[in-house]
Amino acid sequence: MRLCDAWDAHAWVQERKKRFAYFRELRRKVFAATIEASMNGYYMLGDERIELQSASDITSGTKMYCEELVPQPMQSYADVKAEVVNGDCLAVAKTLVDAKIGKVAVLNMASRTSPGGGVISGAGAQEEYLFRCSDYYKSLYQFVDYGAQYNVERNEEYSYPMDRDFGGCYSPNVTIFRGVEEDGYPFLAKTWQVNFIAVAALNRPETVCLPNGSMRLVDYLVPTAKNKIRTIFNIAIDNGVQVLVLGAFGCGAYQNPPVHIAQLFKEILAEPEYRNAFKKVVFAIKQDHNSVSVNNKTLVEVFSEVFGSEAAKTVRKLHVGDVVRHFKRETEASSSTDYLYKIVAFAEHTETGESLVIYQSLYPPFNIWARPYDMFMSEVDKEKYPEIKQKYRFEALSEL
């Protein structure tokens, strides 16, 4: 039996707990199963065969950038205010893709010299995680000789390493077909696609300590750091990206100073070339073993403070079978089941393409409704309903 067909996500999680010292070995198995499924074009979930068709342009549509880019934005939007989210970059991207608010791209905080970073050896930073969850390798392995081992044809014009200042890659329509590491990288019943922008941060740059104790890049490295950030934005503009999912760029294993990096992003995002270039910019920051703390503050807290966020947001996940409570239950419920509903399906509006939640009341007459997904993500208007303690209009019982 193929490794991908016999994958047991729960068993993988338990094995990780028992054999943490062999974590790299366990991650190597994940990538091996990902490659196996991708190269064969399918995987099995029980008795169901899930077809895995890579986008036709995932390799041919990939662009490697080696020089400074000066694109012209296709559209102009209102001044963008970056959001800081405590969550997984793919989970955040999936929410934005489902919301259909514009073309989405995720920043791959990449290795400058090796596509996929240390994914083959089982390393655990963000780029390796992206490779384990998708067919991203088909895009970037064309720029290295060993891509042939994975049936990826060699690009004859471009190669790694990426340019130190202006290097980057745009990868369209990468197919995501595995879940998050915490869940054991389960194979998904429904695949989805998103675009990636790969740019490498400075690797363990020289820093100085200011009198207030804050760390920052030495002066001679600041122009290079700014070039890298502008390259991210320029690649996005050049490819018509409207919604950007960024991260704490280089503030993990590469040991860039978080406060300074956040300040540089804020400064550059306010420049005339970029302040109206995007519909939405979200920093999705996941606190993990690669993250650092700054004066006992998490990366989420650091970026939130720099960007003036009132509070870091956590991505909410809703699933079929979740029982949710409408906020009016706090004031109007007369029985134990009033204003309780069960999510029975997710759907797409046939005319508008809008994502919908199908849910059924758990009280007579057990009506079924279809409402926009965004409605389930929206918060209660506390000015209109000051007495309500519930944060969201609909909250899963597990969140209460």
Placement of each model-derived feature along the sequence:
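Short coil-to-beta transition motif at edge beta-strands of beta-rich domains
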Residues: 315-334
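Intrinsically disordered, low-complexity, charged/polar segments
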Residues: 366-400
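Basic/aromatic-rich interaction segments and small domains that mediate binding to polyanionic partners
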Residues: 346-373
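Macrodomain-like recognition of ADP-ribose-binding/processing modules
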Residues: 1-244, 248-313, 343
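Short, flexible beta-strand-to-coil junctions
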Residues: 110-114, 327-330, 360-365
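Short beta-strand-centered aromatic/proline hotspots
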Residues: 335-348
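Short acidic/polar mixed-charge low-complexity motifs
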Residues: 101, 337, 365-367
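Conserved hydrophobic/aromatic beta-strand scaffold that supports enzyme active sites
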Residues: 106, 196, 323, 356-358
